[in-house]
């Protein structure tokens, strides 16, 4: 499962969970609703909701759209 660091096991967090948490945090930082973010990046509101709830397996193109709308680089959405 996780790697041992200093004798302690570290739980692995999925990329989907990291992406979801980062999208939610960045969206809230901007004071945007899911609908506002969806409008800014040209995606449907339900798509954004599914990403945030970790329901969708998202394509790299859509990660880029979200990042551009949020004013960050795509890799930042995948940084724990």
Residue ranges and their predicted role:
Residues 1-30, 35:
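N-terminal flexible/basic segments that precede or flank functional cores
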Residues 61-76:
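DNA major-groove recognition helix of helix-turn-helix/homeodomain DNA-binding modules
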Residues 39, 79-80:
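Phosphate-coordinating loops and pocket residues in cytosolic domains that bind phosphorylated ligands
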Residues 23, 34, 45, 60-63:
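Helix-turn-helix DNA-binding elements, focusing on the entry/boundary residues of the two helices
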Residues 31-50:
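Short alpha-helical DNA-recognition segment
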Residues 53:
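Short, conserved catalytic or interaction motifs in soluble domains
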Residues 46, 56, 75:
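Key DNA-contact positions within bacterial/archaeal DNA-binding proteins
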Residues 28, 39, 68:
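Alpha-helical residues within the helix-turn-helix
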